[in-house]
């Protein structure tokens, strides 16, 4: 199973995102639904709302992304996946203890990686460098294998 963090999901949802093309290329090889946890929903939808407020995206892009989420859920591209909170936070605390001193992992990185473990994912897709380092340090396979080159945003 493949878990996609918010940087990857947002790249899929926003055609103008620097990472949209590589995200679409990776996702085209998926053979099962993308797990969509409550944390992923909150992070993706809040980021879209913030991007609209900060005029990073237009109202049309914002609304299209929300419609796409609903369509992807209805079509089974995204699948609601619950990560029980007690297990999520138990794993997150352990990841923090083991990896933050070396990687300087942020809480969101830790929670997304813990989510991948709780739902049984063996792969994590991300365009966030710190998230990628943490996932790799925990033994998860990380996609895309390398980061696209260019002037993408520092995530």
What would you call each of these model-derived segments?
Residues 51, 77-133:
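Active-site neighborhoods of divalent-metal-dependent phosphate/nucleic-acid chemistry enzymes
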Residues 39, 45-98, 137:
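Active-site-proximal, substrate-binding regions of enzyme catalytic domains
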Residues 1, 71, 98, 113-155:
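Acidic, PIN/NYN-like endoribonuclease modules and their adjacent C-terminal/linker elements
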Residues 1-42, 47, 51-64, 129, ...:
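Short, well-structured N-terminal submotif of metal-dependent ribonuclease cores
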Residues 26-30, 74, 118:
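A short, N-terminal amphipathic alpha-helix
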């Amino acid at each position: 199973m493949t878990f996609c963090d918010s940087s990857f999901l947002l790249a899929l949802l926003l055609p103008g995102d620097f990472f949209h093309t590589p995200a679409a290329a990776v996702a085209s090889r998926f053979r099962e639904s993308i797990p969509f946890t409550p944390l992923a929903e909150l992070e993706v939808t809040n980021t879209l709302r913030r991007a609209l407020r900060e005029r990073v995206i237009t109202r049309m892009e914002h609304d299209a992304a929300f419609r796409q989420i609903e369509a992807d859920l209805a079509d089974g591209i995204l699948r609601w996946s619950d990560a029980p909170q007690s297990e999520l936070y138990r794993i997150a605390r352990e990841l923090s203890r083991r990896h933050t001193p070396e990687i300087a992992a942020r809480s969101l990185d830790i929670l997304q990686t813990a989510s991948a473990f709780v739902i049984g994912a063996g792969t994590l897709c991300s365009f966030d460098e710190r998230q990628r380092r943490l996932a790799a340090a925990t033994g998860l396979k990380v996609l895309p294998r390398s980061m696209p080159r260019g002037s993408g945003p520092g995530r």
